[in-house]
C-alpha cells in the first residue's frame, strides 16, 4: 500500500509504502475491487526444462565380435548409455553380443536385415527387412527393439508411417566409416557439437573404438549427460 508524504507520518519521511499480502487484503475490499486469486504450483525440484545438457551416442551396423565389446567397455568407464542400431543378419551371427548390449543398460534399435536403401523397396520388402530383424533381436535379447533407423538415413513419410517404431536419424555424422581415424572422430564431434545432439558412429570399425574414449572424455568434461535416443527424442522433435 502506498501513502503520500505527510499522510501517516511526518512529511520529512517522504512517501510511505507498506507490503500487505493480497490474501489478507482481498477480503477487506469491496467486491468490485477484489482480485481473483490463482494458486500457482511451486517449482518441482529437478524438473527438466529442456535446457539440460544431454547427448545420445548411437552405433550402427553391429554387433561386431571385437569392436562392439570395446565400445561397451569404454561406455562402462564413463557410465554412459547409448543406442545400438543393429543389422538383423549380424544379430543372427552374434546374438550373445546383442544380449550383452542390453544387459549393460543400452538401447537396442532395429536397422533392417541387410542395409538396403528403403525408398527403392516395395512396402512388403520394407516390412520384411524390419520383421526379420525384429525376430532376430527378440530371439537374441528376449524383447523387441525400441527404435528404428533407416539405412543411410534414407526414408520417406510413407515409410515412417508403416514402421511400428519411432524413427531416429542423427544430427551429427562423424563420418567414421569414411576417415577411419580415431583423432578425426573426436575432432568431428567437437566441431559439430550442440545440445541434444544425436551422434552417428559405427561399432564395426576399430578406429571408432580407438577414438571413443576421447569423445567420451570431451563430452563428459563439457558437462553432457549420456542418454539413449528414446530419452532424447522428446527434445529434438
Regions found by a protein language model. Give the residues of each.
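Hydrophobic membrane-insertion alpha-helices, especially the h-region
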Residues: 1-4
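Catalytic domains of cell-wall/extracellular-matrix polysaccharide-remodeling enzymes
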Residues: 70, 92-93, 116-237
